[in-house]
Structure formats: C-alpha cells, structure tokens
Amino acid sequence: MLFRSNADTLRALLTARLELAQLLGFATWADFAMADMMIGSPAHLREYLQQIDTASREPATREQAALLAFAREREPALTQISAADSRYWQEQYRRAKYSFDSQSVRPYFPYAAVERGVIATASRLFHIDIRPVSGVRTWHPSVTTYDVYDGDLRLGRIYLDMHPRAGKDKWFSTAPLTLGVHGRQLPEGALVCNFPGGAAGDPGLMQYSDVVIFLHEFGHLMHHVIGGQNPYAGQAAFNVEGDFVEAPSQMLEEFFRDYGVLASFAHHYQSGAVLPRELYERMSRADTFGRASGQQRQLLYTAVSLDFHTLPPATLDFDAVFRGNFERFSPNAYVPGMHMWASFTHLNGYSSNYYTYVLDKVIALDFFAQFDPHDLLGGPAGLRYRRAVLAPGATQPAAQLVRDFLGREPNLDAYRRWLLAQFDSASTISSTAR
C-alpha cells in the first residue's frame, strides 16, 4: 500500500531532521524549529496548547452533543459519529438547523464582483490605492496586474492568477516574486488561485468559503507589499517569525463575516439585488457552528506534528501516535486504517510547527477586536494596524509588533467570544461599510 512507502519516506525525513538538530546542539528537531519562533520551545507550546484545549473543549462537547442528537433522530441506533461521516452530519445539521445551503449564496458572489470587493476592502482598510495596470507582460493572458499606491508613492506591484487551467498548480497561495528594498527595488507578488470563472460566459459563482479564502490570500499579498519598504531584503514581511505569518491574513478573514462589508459587493449576478440580510443571517449562524470542534481538530494536527518531531524516529509508531491524539481531541469514532499522517503534507513544510494556525488564530481575533464593529473600515484602527503590524515587516520581533498594536500582551478573550458565538442569540452587529 502507498501509505507504507510514505511511512519510509517520513521516517527518513524525521531521522535526518533529528540528526541536523543534534549537530546544532538541540535535543530534538522541534527544539531547533521553535528556537527562533514566537513560541520559543516545545515546553512553552505544550503550556499554550493546554490553554487552547481548556477554552475549546467545553463548547466542542456542546457542539458534538447537538450533532449526535440530530444524527440519532435520523439513525436511532447511532451511538457515536464516525470520523468518516462527521463532515456529512455537520452539513446536514447546518441545513436543518439554520435552513442554509451553501449553494444558495453563490449567485451573489460572481468572481469579478468579489475581486472588486476584495480590492476595495483592502484599499479602504489600509488607506492605499490599488490601480489596474495594462500592457504588462505576464506568464499567461488571464493574469491581471495592479500597482499599489500610498497617495502618489508606488509601494509595489501585484499579479492575480486566479482561475484554473491545464498544467497550473491546483492550490491557493501567495508567491513573493521580488523582495522590496527601500529606495532601490519595489516588492512584487502574485496570488495563484483556482477560483471559478475565467472562461467566456462563466460568471464564476463562488462559495462563501472561497470568498473568505480570497481575502485571506490577499492579506498575505498586502503584508508582502506594505511590509516590503525597509532598508534590507532580509527585513521583508515574510521573513518575520514563521509562527506569526498567518496572523495578518487570518485577521483579514473576519472582515468578510460582516454584513456591511459583504453587502458592498455581494450583488446577484443577474438581478443586481444585494445579498438579503435574512440570508446572510442564516449563513452567518451556520458559519459559527463547528468552530470549537474545528479548533480541537487543529489541536489534534498540532499534537501529531509535535510528537512526530520529539519522539525518537527509529521506534516511532505513526499509527499509534496519531490514534492516541485522535482519541484525545476528537469525539468521533476512529476509523482503523485511515493513516491520515501518511498524507499530512504540512509535516513537510511546517514540520513540527503546525501550531502556527492555532497561535495565529488567537492573535488574529485579538487584532480584529480592536476595530469598531459599527465602522470596520472607516475607523482609525486600519491605518494604525498597517503602521504597527504590516509596515515594519521583519524589522522587529513579531511579539513586539503584536504588543505595539494591542498595547498589551495578547490574550484569549476574543478567541473565547468567537468560540461561543454560536450559543449567543444576539443579532449580528453590522458595520456601515456600504
């Protein structure tokens, strides 16, 4: 079976990493990989993960109880939901509980309108001007080009390669093309995505989740450009500590959970009607369900990546370690033979540091809580955030950037509110972004 050959490859990778770490004086690869990160060490990480587990476990238990009760109404003999069926039951629950089908909002998110909305949102939030550029030579005719300005000062150039085609990478990513050097070289970057559309007559109707992904990736691009104005290329934004790099883009996601921001561009591709508030409310409530369970799942992946890089690779039982963590963090029934670790590609790029997604979610929500919910894009927080967090790039430690914007150490308050939003019957606050 393929997973067995992947096991050999993974064991060889872990062995080589351990050898390198020990040559450099570290006990494990995880100690080496975290030494110059915000988290500092595996010991500090384990302490932090305990805090996240404490915050998310109780609401995750409530989510699972509701989901199991719903499933048992349809299958009375069911005692535990299988890991293989979990996503199915979650989708059925959202449809029944919130009367929301993810397909119902797609007509309000044609690709061209979403692109305009993303650009307009970033422009207003960061006090910049993003202007289309014509006549630029690109690697494919479908690629569009924009220059980013601060007043009359050009900050950099971005390329959007947004639709699938033969031979193209199938993922969604941000690619820095040129690092900025103040006074000598402007930063350039590209989004390489696979969103619907791109063909004549195809409006490219997008799922809401795709709309959020677009803004997330655009957040990386803005970090690269705005943070690429420093004296040295090594101070570019993406050279900040690796366990901070997802925080700015995850923070930006939250703006597209606001009705005022969405309604500024979410118009029906045929009638031009604005996304109905009632449909948004159902979508928003459905979106809150499963957050805590999702965070427990992130803890599972974090624990696996950490254990794989701290336990001796020669005797490491991949299935046993994965199953032990699965049973610790997942309420679902384990499926023997799933071998998820054998296709866990983050073990290659992130190695022991998958925790980045968990840490940065907490920081991102703390950041977002500093914005006025009644005027998300128009208040002073956007420019202050740009100057304190994005513009410095890697000239300062990430922890200092966080403190400079928050005025304090980060905490879990906003994260806890985010986890519990599904149990809050209060109506959703909307900004005046329109």
Segments (PLM) and residue ranges:
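Short small-residue beta-strand/loop micro-motif enriched in glycine and branched aliphatics
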Residues: S41-P42, D169, A199-P203, A233
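Active-site-proximal, well-structured secondary-structure segments within enzyme catalytic domains
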Residues: R11, T15-A16, L20-N194, E254-A303, ...
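C-terminal, non-catalytic "cap/extension" segments appended to globular domains
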Residues: R95, A113, G117-I130, T138-H140, ...
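Short connector loops/turns at beta-strand edges and beta->alpha or beta->beta junctions
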Residues: W29, P196-G198, G227
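Short pre-active-site segment immediately N-terminal to the catalytic Zn-binding motif
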Residues: P110, P196-L215
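Short hydrophobic "helix-edge" motifs at membrane interfaces and signal-peptide entry regions
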Residues: L14-A16, M206-Q207, Q396-A398
